[in-house]
Amino acid sequence: MSKDPKNPGVELNRTSLYMGLVLVLVIILLFSNYFIN
């Protein structure tokens, strides 16, 4: 548990967080298209 600001673990966690947000947005778009049609 180093306090290095360039810790790869923090970057990996941030990347996974952004990927999760993108995945949720894609799912919302798919469901909205499904319900509109």
From Swiss-Prot:
Taxonomic source organism: Gloeobacter violaceus (strain ATCC 29082 / PCC 7421)
Q: Which SUPFAM superfamilies match?
A: Photosystem II reaction center protein L, PsbL
Keyword Transmembrane helix tagged: yes
Q: Which family does it belong to?
A: Belongs to the PsbL family.
Question: Keywords of this protein's UniProt record, alphabetized?
Answer: Cell inner membrane, Cell membrane, Membrane, Photosynthesis, Photosystem II, Reaction center, Transmembrane, Transmembrane helix
Any one GO BP annotation for this protein? photosynthesis
Q: Which residues cross the membrane?
A: 16-36
Its localization reads: Cell inner membrane
Q: How does it sit in the membrane?
A: Single-pass membrane protein
Q: Name one Pfam family in it.
A: PsbL
Q: Any S-S bridges, and between which cysteines?
A: none
Chief localization:
membrane
Name the chain's protein. Answer: Photosystem II reaction center protein L
Its assembly, as annotated, is: PSII is composed of 1 copy each of membrane proteins PsbA, PsbB, PsbC, PsbD, PsbE, PsbF, PsbH, PsbI, PsbJ, PsbK, PsbL, PsbM, PsbT, PsbX, Psb30/Ycf12, peripheral proteins PsbO, CyanoQ (PsbQ), PsbU, PsbV and a large number of cofactors. It forms dimeric complexes.
What exactly does this protein do? One of the components of the core complex of photosystem II (PSII). PSII is a light-driven water:plastoquinone oxidoreductase that uses light energy to abstract electrons from H(2)O, generating O(2) and a proton gradient subsequently used for ATP formation. It consists of a core antenna complex that captures photons, and an electron transfer chain that converts photonic excitation into a charge separation. This subunit is found at the monomer-monomer interface and is required for correct PSII assembly and/or dimerization.
UniProt keyword annotation of Lipoprotein present? no
GO CC terms for this protein? Answer: cytoplasm; photosystem II reaction center; plasma membrane
